[in-house]
Amino acid sequence: MYPNMKRIFVYITLPLLLVCTAVSAQETVSPLDSVDLGNLFRLQANGNPDKCRAIFEKSPEVDIANALYGQFSGLLVENGYDTYDSNQAKRKLALRLHGHTPLLLVDGISRSLDDIDGIEIDKVEVLKDAAASALYGVKGGDGVVSITTKRGKDSPLKVTAKYQYGFATPFRAPEFADAYTYGFLVNEARMLDGLPAKYNEAELFALYSGQYPYAYPNVNWWDEVYRDHGDNHQAEFTFMGGSRNFRYFAAVDYLKEDFLYKKATADDRYNANHYDNRLGIRANVDVNITESTMMKINVKARLAEFNRGNYSDRIENTLYYLPSAAFPVKQADGTYGGTSQYGAVNPVAQMQERGQKLYSQTKVLADMLLRQDLGVFVEGLSADVNVAFDYIGRLSEEAKKEFRYSELVSTVAAQGDSSYILSDQLYYGTDSKTVSFSHWFSSLEMKMELQTRLNWERNFGAHHVDAHAAYRQRSWILSGQNNSSKTQEILGSVSYNWKKRFFADVVVNYSGSAYMPKDKRFHWYPAVSLAAIVLDGDPYLKVYGSAGLSGSDGDLRHELWRQNYVSGNSYYFGGNGGTSYSGRTEGDMAAVTLTPELSRRATFGIDLGLFRKRLAINAEGFMEDRRNILIYPSNISEVIGVDVNEQSIGENTYKGIDLSVAWNDRHGDFDYGLYANGGWLFTKVIEDGQAYQMYDYLYRKGNPVGQCYGLEVIGIFQNQMEINNSPQQTFGAVLPGDLKYRDQNGDGIIDSQDRVKMFGSYKPLLNFGFGLHAGYKNFKVYADFQGVTGVTISLLGSPLYSPLRSSTTISQTFLDREVTWAPGREAYATMPRLTTQESSNNYRDNSLWYRDGSFIKLRNVGISYTIPKKALKLCDATVSLTGTNLFSLDNIRFADPEQLDAYYPSTRVVWAGVKFNF
């Protein structure tokens, strides 16, 4: 346990117990107990926000972001390539709202997805209009995802207990060539490289026959490291109830995830098995202290540990590149296999013999809202104080050990009808025998947030006014230098409606970021929104629109605006034996244009309800001009004599349409529902600081954000004569079998001036989801699908499409799908020749490697049955069977289109669970 954890526990729990004791005898009903922590400012002139309540009840996800796939128009869940955590086996997921990373709020406090478990969530809202964004000033420009946790009710105690077991299997696991196939093809590649063969005929036969398993092994490294399934265990408990003056909700969630890796049992002095343990505890308390005073206290504690072997990098970085013939798992004498060429990369030894790494994380998140009704002074007036404090500590523990490995340097020669082998065993490394243990704090993190508000709400006949004035400050401090982030805001909002038919909101935010110099720190972010309910019956029609400004400091860093000086050349004072003094010189040029990104946003939409609102339709269009984007400009002349730092000069535009349709109906004991939603996103680069280009097609301006560029492949060189008669090639030596490119500018040279835009963007044009649910009496079924289209991915991101390069392996997956060029295969080759070299000519961005990355996935499907309480006497029970990520329709087929690189494999999981309601 961390040294300060006991103290923090006392600081948080003691006031909570005192409050509970003080109010236990109160019987007065407070009019303030309906405060919605997820909607404290109560803007009215917008559409019905995208809202979802039931998804976390039906979706047994280890990562709650999985449950959000396809549930909200415009919200994309994707692999977080920029959120890799080396302490975890799996890549985290990230949210993208209209191409940006939205601000995530939990009960009105800025937090992360890692801070909450699905069992705690009451509702999720996606706020996309300009007025909602302006409320959060310099943090609101990327949109807002607001999560509200469950709260207690004036009711007897209700208890739920749930257990689920998840059976995980790899989704499209790769297959790699066996030793003989590898040996045969590496000989072919070396021949095409103009190099001698690596294996003679007798050695190839040895690889095929397994006659000499230590000198010429055939190892399926994937099967040596992975088992055929992983196991997940999840247990959840909730407690809800209370009186009119004291209400509570508590939850306990435990998850143990045993990964696909095989058990590591080589040394009983440490545990090198891969597992992830998480324990989450939440307590939400609502207290009516007096008739005019209300308090909400939320406390979340999360303990997590991730354990793995003490290898230096992801084990997949070895599995995807190590040939099956490289070396055996172990030699005959028991030493681990390895070579002087590959070093100590034996993945089995790395997992079992290097020791253990255990990462522990403790989170304590606490926030409190105190609301005082001031109606005795001014009718409709109230005041809020909202305080949050988060403490996150990360501890690393290590057991370290080294291992010895060896190789057999062998030659097989033919002797008549038989063969003989000559071997020399070479040893490397040392077996440390002893295990050293150490531990250290990886990081300490503190977040503090303070919000104070004055609220005024009055009715004047048919007129209703709701106004707020607030001050907000946030502080995030991470151990290390220049790792803090601080903001301050003063904001106000006024909402008006007439007979709940016509609505108007005005928001003004004056917000500043500590990343900026003091004289340029604060900026104004105003917004206005209007709405009208045109039809308030059947049918129902509401139209709304908004326009305003908001900001984002997410890409800023400390000291970018400051001119720094770094060590320069030295100068000697004195004669022989004089003293050298280091000089100083200008570092990167200061970001003189530094300012937070500015979002100028406008939205317009409709909410439509038909057939007694069984059919609900929402359509919303938006336009955003995004300015002051931080980029590295290349259009600043080098005559200034220093390197150029990032500057806030970029500009992009984002336009799109979000559409959602839902139908829900009931006939007696049968109910059902259908839904579909989609978000279209059109982007354009307006300014990116690109230097002057000789040809218009080289400019990125006017193209979509994330547009793919590359050389246009027009064929494969068939012979040296064709190479000689072609334009000059500048990407390394070119041989028959290499890719042939179009000379776009006709200058007789193939170089970077011939890159053109091709295919589409890395950002999807359309993100969509659809699904259904049905129930008959105690039976329920559901299915959720999600997909994207209009997105381009590159096979260069997959190690399976880099066969044999730089002494790596070749995958059977690649061989089953493609035909490489070689003499005799020219007519039907789909890929360039095999090579053991780097081949910078072939393996660069070009039209051969880009592929359509569209897909449709079955994200969730499930069936459940509830056994009523009258049958069990004590409680009712629900048994369920659920599948996640079961299949994908796409053009890639050999891998998960969302994850082509060398990483822990995607998994499909089948869950079986039982839930008791007491």
Regions found by a protein language model. Give the residues of each.
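Membrane-proximal, glycine/serine-rich, low-complexity loop/turn segments characteristic
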Residues: 2, 8, 17, 23-103, ...
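Sec-dependent signal peptide hydrophobic core
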Residues: 9-16, 381
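Short aromatic-centered micro-motifs
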Residues: 104, 496, 744, 774
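Short, glycine/acidic-rich beta->alpha junctions
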Residues: 108, 127-130, 139-143, 229-231, ...
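Flexible glycine-rich, low-complexity coil/linker segments exposed to the extracellular/periplasmic environment
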Residues: 172, 176-222, 322-352, 399-445, ...
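Extracellular/periplasmic, surface-exposed regions of secreted and cell-surface proteins
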Residues: 284-289, 293, 299-303, 312, ...
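Extracytoplasmic gating/loop element in the C-terminal half of outer-membrane beta-barrel translocons
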Residues: 330-334, 733, 788-878, 883
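Gram-negative outer-membrane beta-barrel transporters
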Residues: 647-764, 775-778, 786-791, 795-797
